[in-house]
A protein has these predicted regions:
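A conserved beta-strand element that flanks and buttresses the S-adenosyl-L-methionine
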Residues: 91
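Short alpha-helix
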Residues: 152-169
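Class I SAM-dependent methyltransferase SAM/SAH-binding core
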Residues: 38-79
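Conserved Class I S-adenosyl-L-methionine
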Residues: 158, 171-235
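Conserved alpha-helix/loop element of class I SAM-dependent methyltransferases that forms part
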Residues: 10-29
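A short glycine-rich, Lys/Arg-flanked "PGG" loop and its adjoining helix->strand segment in the class I
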Residues: 103-117
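Conserved class I S-adenosyl-L-methionine
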Residues: 28-37, 118-143
Length: 235
């Protein structure tokens, strides 16, 4: 594959790979992935971590994960079916922005984690014009999702992710940010905008706002989001 052919590809797999590297650097013997979906992270750890568990609320995704031999149970982030300090590392991949009560989920993960919690979340470097435009478009899109009943918040900052931790906590907190700057095709951005508008019974106001965002996008371009890796580790 030529270098040019990768310039408009979503760098998401790169960020997920770096998350796995960070996780394996901690040499866990057991991992629980919360909101594991079909088990992509667990599958990538199969030959590297002795004990793997996943939790997800979606029975369809659970069945897909189980079909390839992964140990995944139905549950949610607020009541993990594990004893205190029974799992080395608890992970969240692009999950916090789908949770109505992240502090509660983090507290529950820290209860279960023997060594700590790792989080992979989206992140924008808003000092870059194409990133700022992308962040504004995403905020517009997520507002529509929320209006139609979905829990879909903006990507939380590292400060927001750790705000609920007591100031006197003995956790070691580390943050890494990653950005592979690749531009999105405008046709894809426009198509996704129209798809979001179709969810609304009266989309006129949202359409006007979208047009303003698209005008900015034609000036700056729209780049894929970066990612932040947050580690909350027991000292």
């Amino acid at each position: 594959m030529s270098e040019t052919s990768t310039l408009d590809q979503d760098p998401d797999p790169i960020y997920r790979g770096r998350f796995v590297e960070r996780l394996l650097a901690l040499a866990p013997r057991s991992v629980l992935d919360v909101g594991c979906g079909t088990g992509g992270l667990l599958a990538s750890l199969r030959s590297k971590v002795a004990e793997l568990h996943g939790i997800d609320p979606d029975p369809v995704r659970i069945n897909e994960a189980r079909a390839v031999g992964l140990r995944v149970d139905r549950g949610d982030a607020y009541a993990l079916p594990f004893d205190a300090q029974s799992i080395d590392i608890v992970t969240f991949q692009f999950v916090p922005h789908h949770l109505a009560d992240w502090p509660r989920a983090l507290a529950e993960a820290l209860r279960v984690a023997r060594h700590g919690v790792l989080v992979l979340e989206g992140w924008y470097d808003r000092s870059i014009p194409s990133q700022e435009t992308a962040a504004q478009l995403e905020a517009w899109s997520k507002a529509i999702d929320r209006a139609t009943g979905m829990v879909h918040e903006d990507y939380p900052s590292a400060g927001a992710l750790t705000a609920s931790l007591p100031a006197t906590s003995h956790q070691r907190i580390e943050q890494q940010t990653h950005l592979v700057l690749r531009m999105r095709a405008m046709s894809d951005v426009e198509r996704e905008g129209e798809s979001q508008l179709a969810k609304l019974p009266a989309p006129d106001q949202a359409r006007q706002l979208l047009q303003r965002h698209l005008a900015a996008a034609r000036r700056t371009g729209v780049s894929y989001e970066g990612a932040t890796i947050l580690s909350v580790l027991r000292a």
